[in-house]
């Protein structure tokens, strides 16, 4: 299958995500453990199978990196990256608005198109190089807000908890309130809209990060990678405050290690 441009490709991808959910969500869902502090459901698996089958048919020469069946494939060059159900733990625990399907297309190691779909609200978010970010087909850019009126969202794991807790301590009088959502797709979309003044998460698997990060880039968010973390903000003021706090925490951690 050929697409004329990245915008058309992003539209193809969102249609595919919608079709996959419509087909697969009718099945009974089983939940299983997936390593330490993680879950996988039968819906994850059936969605991934549906989407990858379609991609292989329409783009037979393009490799696919995906969470459940193709996670060992090297994320390099030109490829699709897919998270069939991002926010699985939220989904498995009945948090029905806090999960989504996401995909991105990477060309020569550069993300050029992505799509995110939220079934609970039937909401679509797409991004395409040279075209921008779109909510349900309508182009948008991030909405700035004063830091004092903004939410700071962190996406954390057990391994990051101490660092993130210290970050919240540093910023508790800067931002209005804090949130922990636990779904990369939701986090990035909310940050791209300006619903979060700041978002902090560890740079992780390509299927978790690339679709939403590209959306935030195309929505003209402020984005910085610091150490192993990604910081997304709706203003320079918010970005500066988060970076300043992070640098202080990292410096203190280094000093503690040296003292030992």
Where do the model's predicted regions map?
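A short, compositionally biased
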Residues: 26, 99, 127-131, 217, ...
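DPxDG-like acidic metal-binding loop motif
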Residues: 75-134
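An extended, acidic
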Residues: 144-260
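Residue-level signal for inorganic ion chemistry
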Residues: 17, 21-24, 44, 55, ...
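A structural micro-motif at secondary-structure boundaries
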Residues: 135-141
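Generic detector of well-ordered alpha-helical packing
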Residues: 45, 68, 84-87, 119, ...
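N-terminal subdomain of lithium-sensitive/metallo-dependent phosphomonoesterases centered on the IMPase/IPPase/PAP
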Residues: 1-85, 258-260
